[in-house]
């Protein structure tokens, strides 16, 4: 049974939302999980990826590669990592695009906005844990 009636489970609508998403929506969709150390430190599970974060690829052909994020290509939903390149036939090098779902964040670039985001997400998690679930027996 569907839990939220405002969210469509239609393939057609999901694809349309994916391909017509604005840059701000794509930023949220391009989130990645935090490493275990960062997760325990900040009490946050995932964050949107940004330039200068350090990541580790955990699945795909480039598994176990680590590096700094050089660019977030929102139009293609990929990120570029500094040490992941391929040499083309003409001798030039090109970046390999990696899906954000295939990486985990190992080191964050923190500025005042990112710190505020972490604090805000941590506060909502703490508030949810403080709530007591009450179940009513209907007989």
Swiss-Prot record:
Chain intervals for the UniProt region annotation (Disordered): 1-25
Keyword Ribosomal protein carried by entry: yes
UniProt keyword Transmembrane helix, yes or no: no
Source domain of life: Eukaryota
A matching Pfam family: Ribosomal_L26
Gene Ontology biological-process annotations: cytoplasmic translation; ribosomal large subunit biogenesis
Record family assignment: Belongs to the universal ribosomal protein uL24 family.
Gene3D superfamilies xref list: 2.30.30.30
InterPro entries listed in its UniProt record: KOW, Rib_uL2_dom2, Ribosomal_uL24_CS, Ribosomal_uL24_euk/arc, Ribosomal_uL24_KOW, Translation_prot_SH3-like_sf
This protein's GO CC annotations: cytosolic large ribosomal subunit
Name recorded for this polypeptide: Large ribosomal subunit protein uL24
Record lineage: Eukaryota, Amoebozoa, Evosea, Eumycetozoa, Dictyostelia
Organism: Dictyostelium discoideum (Social amoeba)
Underlying gene: rpl26
Keywords: Ribonucleoprotein, Ribosomal protein
One MF annotation (Gene Ontology) recorded for this entry: structural constituent of ribosome
